[in-house]
Each structure stands twice: as C-alpha cells, then as structure tokens.
Amino acid sequence: MSKSLKKLVEESREKNQPEVDMSDRGISNMLDVNGLFTLSHITQLVLSHNKLTMVPPNIAELKNLEVLNFFNNQIEELPTQISSLQKLKHLNLGMNRLNTLPRGFGSLPALEVLDLTYNNLSENSLPGNFFYLTTLRALYLSDNDFEILPPDIGKLTKLQILSLRDNDLISLPKEIGELTQLKELHIQGNRLTVLPPELGNLDLTGQKQVFKAENNPWVTPIADQFQLGVSHVFEYIRSETYKYLYGRHMQANPEPPKKNNDKSKKISRKPLAAKNR
C-alpha cells in the first residue's frame, strides 16, 4: 500500500499532475505519506475515507490547492495554517469529529463550497471571522449541534445553497432574509416553531428552488400552510397578520421545544453516506 502511495507522489511530481487521489487507503497520518507536502503544484487532493485524526500545519505548503477533500475521516481539529490556502475553492470536511474550527478560518478568500456536514459543531464552534467567507456559494452544516444560527449569516450574500438539516435550531435570524441569491434552503429536522417574516424576502417557491422544512414542531398556523404547499407558507409569512403574530410570539419568549437527544437518526445515516462522495 505504501509503495502505491509513494508511486502516486512520484508520478504527480514527474508528470506535473495537478490532481492526487488518495481516498480509501487506510492513511492515519498525512506525514506518513513521504513527499506529499513537496507537491506544491497540485490543485486537488482527495483524502476521503481514510483514518486521519488531524491535519498537520504542513498543509500550508500545498499553496496551489483549489479542492481539498477530507470527507469521512476522524479529524478532531484543524491547524490555523489551513487558512493560508489562498486559492482553495472547495473544502469538504463532512463526516469527521470537529467540535471547533481554528482561529482565522474565515480568511480563505476564494472559498466557494464548504461542507461541514456530520460533525459536532455548534454556534460556539465558529471563530469570530467565520462569516468573512463572503465568496461562499454553498454552506453545508447539516447533522451538527447548532441551536442558533448567528445573525452574521446575512453577510454571506452570495450563498445559493444553505443546508441546516438535523441540527437543534430553535429559531432562524431575520438576517436570513438578506440571502437574496439563495436557491436551496434545508431546515428539516430541527426544533423550529416559527419562521422570521424576513424569510419572505426570498424566492424559494419556484420550480428550480428547493425549500425543505419537514419534521419541525411548527405552530398551528404555519403547519396548516405547509399542508397547502410551500407557496402558501411564503404567502402567509409575508402577510401583515403573520408579522403581528410573529412579533407577539417572540415577545412572549415561549419555552423552546425539548431537545431531541436521540441522535440515532444521525448515526444510522453514517454507513449509508460513507461511500457516496
């Protein structure tokens, strides 16, 4: 196995190949792959389906990376040096064990797609500059532990896809209404009871748009609209009646629905998703 990894490194260097695929090789430490960090010319590195628990600071030496895929490992932390990958456009960290992101993570000036699905992240995991990632077009935060989506989400004005499925969200900030380029919003499987009226600023009811919101404990008026269809929900939350009811609801500060501690739904998806990317 190690010989074939060595050969991959040598071939990439000799033939100046920009893409290196080391997925599903049983790698537990990137430093064990001799010569990997000398491949400063590569633009794509795939290390999905391995046994990595950390990413070494040397990652910064791969300064031309545009695509970096760590999907389905056991990574618990990232080095601050990851933010020096100034050309990185696509970062997949889905299905790992991250409960925090490093300081300065938000200074990736070219990042367009960030996949953090199935980790242990919450609103407290995000560094102060996370929402400086203003080039993001797709942000996947499903299957984490978010109870609150920070209002700074509104700064990510280029977002077209936002996936928040299966978290513990008890509310959405009004700033979500500033994401006017959004084409897909996934909020199913949370603890949401109401929607901010500002969500009505978005067009998520067309044939090319996706709005998924099932498995939430909606208040009765919203649940009734969902029975009629998504376009009815959006029509309703734009109404003056709803804005008034929403204001009353928020003033009353009701107790949020109980947390769903049954994470078996999350765990059961893991083996199914393991080979899908």
Swiss-Prot record:
Keywords: Acetylation, Leucine-rich repeat, Repeat. PROSITE patterns: LRR (PS51450). One of its GO terms (cellular component) is extracellular exosome. GO terms for biological process: intracellular signal transduction; positive regulation of cell-substrate adhesion; positive regulation of GTPase activity; signal transduction. Pfam families: LRR_14 (PF23598), LRR_8 (PF13855). LRR repeats lie at residues 41-63, 64-85, 87-109, 110-133, 135-156, 158-179, 181-202. The modification N-acetylserine is found at residue 2. It comes from the Eukaryota. InterPro entries: Leu-rich_rpt (IPR001611), Leu-rich_rpt_typical-subtyp (IPR003591), LRR_dom_sf (IPR032675), LRR_domain-containing (IPR050216), LRR_R13L4/SHOC2-like (IPR055414). SMART domains: LRR_BAC, LRR_TYP. The keyword Chaperone does not apply. Residues 1-24, 250-277 are annotated as: Disordered. Gene3D superfamilies: Ribonuclease Inhibitor. The keyword Transport does not apply. Residues 7-24, 256-265 have a biased composition (Basic and acidic residues). Potentially plays a role in the Ras signal transduction pathway. Capable of suppressing v-Ras transformation in vitro. This is Ras suppressor protein 1. It comes from Homo sapiens (Human).
